Curated annotation (Swiss-Prot):
Pathway: Carbohydrate degradation; L-arabinose degradation via L-ribulose; D-xylulose 5-phosphate from L-arabinose (bacterial route): step 2/3. The keyword Phosphoprotein does not apply. GO terms for biological process: L-arabinose catabolic process to xylulose 5-phosphate. One of its GO terms (cellular component) is cytoplasm. Its EC number is 2.7.1.16. It is an enzyme of class 2 (transferase). GO terms for molecular function: ATP binding; D-ribulokinase activity; ribulokinase activity. SUPFAM superfamilies: Actin-like ATPase domain. Belongs to the ribulokinase family. This is Ribulokinase. It holds the Pfam family FGGY_N. Keywords: Arabinose catabolism, ATP-binding, Carbohydrate metabolism, Kinase, Nucleotide-binding, Transferase. It catalyses: D-ribulose + ATP = D-ribulose 5-phosphate + ADP + H(+); L-ribulose + ATP = L-ribulose 5-phosphate + ADP + H(+).
Length: 545
């Protein structure tokens, strides 16, 4: 019997899973928050801009080393039987290293320089660079722009590199390699310097046929092309292929066999499709956590405005993978819960329940529209379909009678409406949606929210029995790399997670939500582009520390 390891690096924590490659059974798991968390307001006591979201890469090694040691010890599995390791990671999460793959933030002189640290996916400090990249692409009619939804996000790799070039050239001077954090973990495991086609294709303006778009980079700054060529470009390994064996020293350190194979890293949300078994077209999968990614597969490459990218073979070989998303979902609900009145917090504590459970109890019998509220869920910008990280959230319909649970429900509904905008965009561009899957901790824990989604989308909603689909998906790739299965599809069939429950839409609720959605779309269009300057002008008054 063989086993594989899936290491899942999320926004706030990391997970290491040991999986039976025959039946997908979770043999052992390790979950730990990052020691330094997300660095957002201060770095070593120094204030940093509110658009920044950084991390300390030492936390990633801590997860890997402690996690693998734990699952091997706890499971009592002979390491010889662990055939492969797969990695998934939030993206685009960028790391800057020296020639030995050591992160430059560990250098003493850069300890307090935020640009030396890992730039987490939700770091929006490169918004000016993203705008410049977009405008240059538009002016020069770059054909690839349609593959990225006709937009450029500050969350992607190239704008973040430009940000460091512009604002911290001393960091760039000391940097030998720039890569996705997922690639960094793979390279640390194998002592190689490779890149995954998934990370490059979705986040770095790279295509298998043409490579990087140096013609565009040259028009922005010839130095940018040189940085990409010297520090980013490396041999590319496709999803489903093998990077190589564990480095001997790393195998000894982790207590694993040096024959253990390592797969290329896959973006965390994309790994979820493998983990739940969504491997066909006409299926939209919502990977719900801090944010939500909306993923689809298709045999053709369509140029869908407002999506985050389309890459061939980034999840399943020969199929184009499509990604869209919402930047604040779990984060938004957590924000609302933290604003709950003390009486709600006390009631929840007295009844031995969470604030979320209390608010769900209060709203579960409300009909759509009963509160009179509607909201825009842009507290961390809008990724799809407006592709504008500078947009901000709004709520409409407040009265002196509005209760906190009404606000909570309005935000649940807002995220569902945002998902419907994305689903309709896919459908408008020749990608039919017949099934909708939901996976992650939120769907499993929040049936009230899933009921709202089913009725807003007017689709049967299939909720998967897994909080950890990305880790399962990563382990599936590890199993393939280790030879336990001949193909990704075979591994998915054997190891995928089961269905927890299904929800069918209800006609009356669907009709009421259609009315609310029209109002949402009107507000979306007004504040998203027709008069987006209203909230942006207010935001411009904020003073950076």
């Amino acid at each position: 019997m063989s086993y594989s390891i899936g290491i899942d690096y999320g926004t706030a924590s990391g997970r290491v899973f040991l999986i039976n490659t025959t039946n997908g059974q979770v043999v052992s798991k390790f979950v730990k928050p990052y020691t330094h968390g997300v660095i957002e307001s201060e770095l070593n006591g120094l204030k940093i801009p509110h658009t920044y979201a950084l991390q300390n890469s030492n936390d990633y090694l801590e997860i890997m080393e402690e996690g693998i040691s734990y699952i091997v010890r706890e499971s009592k599995i002979d390491p010889v039987n662990i055939v492969g390791i797969g990695i998934d990671f939030t993206s685009s999460t960028i790391i800057f290293t020296d020639e030995n793959l050591n992160p430059v933030h560990n250098l003493k002189q850069f300890k307090n320089n935020p640009h030396a640290y890992v730039k987490l996916w939700k770091h929006h400090g490169a918004y000016k660079e993203a705008e410049k990249l977009y405008q240059t692409a538009i002016e020069n009619n770059n054909k690839w722009l349609g593959h990225y939804g006709y937009n450029v996000s500050s969350e992607w790799m190239i704008p973040k590199i430009m940000e460091v070039m512009n604002r911290a050239p001393e960091i760039m001077e000391k940097t030998a390699y720039i890569m996705e954090a997922g690639d960094w973990i793979v390279n640390k495991l194998t002592n190689k310097n490779v890149r995954s086609n998934c990370g490059l294709g979705f986040k770095a303006f790279w295509e298998e046929e043409t490579g990087f778009h140096y013609d565009l980079f040259d028009k922005i700054d010839p130095k940018l092309s040189k940085v990409i060529q010297d520090k980013v470009s490396a041999p590319v390994v496709n999803i489903g292929e093998v990077v190589g064996k564990l480095d001997d020293k790393m195998a000894q350190k982790l207590g694993l066999s040096k024959e253990t194979m390592v797969s290329p890293f896959i973006i965390d949300a994309h790994a979820s499709l493998l983990g739940i078994g969504s491997e066909k077209d006409k299926e939209m999968t919502m990977v719900m956590g801090t944010s939500t990614c909306h993923l689809m597969l298709n045999e053709k490459q369509h140029q869908v405005p407002g999506i985050s990218g389309s890459v061939k073979g980034a999840i399943i070989p020969e199929l184009f993978a499509y990604e869209a998303g919402q930047s604040a979902v779990g984060d938004l609900f957590e924000y609302v819960a933290k604003q709950a009145p003390k009486s709600y917090v006390d009631e929840a504590a007295n009844r031995n329940m969470t604030v979320f459970e209390l608010m769900n109890e209060k709203i579960k019998h409300q009909m759509p529209g009963e509160s009179g509220l509607i909201a825009l869920d842009w507290h961390n910008g809008n990724r799809s379909v407006l592709s504008d990280s500078n947009l901000t959230g709004c709520i409409f319909g407040l009265t002196l009678q509005t209760k906190h649970e009404d606000i909570y429900r309005a935000y649940l509904e807002a995220t569902a409406f945002g998902t419907k905008m994305i689903m309709q965009q896919y459908q408008d561009w020749h990608m039919e949606v017949e099934k909708v899957f939901a996976c992650g901790g939120i769907p499993k824990k929040n049936a009230v929210m899933m009921d709202i989604y089913a009725n807003v989308l007017n689709k049967k909603l299939i909720v998967m029995d897994s909080e950890y689909a990305p880790a399962i998906g990563a382990a599936i790739l590890g199993a393939v790399s280790g030879g336990a299965h001949n193909s990704i599809n075979d591994a998915v069939d054997a190891m995928k997670e089961p269905i927890l429950y299904e929800i069918n839409p209800e006609a009356e609720k669907v009709q009421r939500y259609e009315t609310l959605f029209k109002a949402y779309k009107a507000l979306h269009d007004i504040h998203g582009y027709k008069k987006a300057n209203i909230m942006k002008d207010i935001q411009s008054l904020r003073v950076e520390g």
